[in-house]
Amino acid sequence: MKSVKININSIDKVKKFVNVLTKYDGDFDLVSGHYVIDAKSIMGIFSLDLSEDIELVIQDDVEQEEVLKAIKDFLV
């Protein structure tokens, strides 16, 4: 498991972020305060405060480095 901070503060960034993550089979969570949502869920993401940085938790260690490279544009 790995945790990183991301910034997806626009509709376009959210769409691109979800499109990247849906290419992977692993489980990804977004944590904002006490809320934890599925990072592949556009509706769930829009329930968060996108003006703040959000914590992405990558549950699958196998694809971890590949996923981090794919989301490098969103990392804080």
Residues of each region from the PLM?
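C-terminal structural segments of small proteins and small subunits
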Residues: 47-76
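N-terminal intrinsically disordered, cationic/polar leader segments
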Residues: 4, 18-24, 29, 36, ...
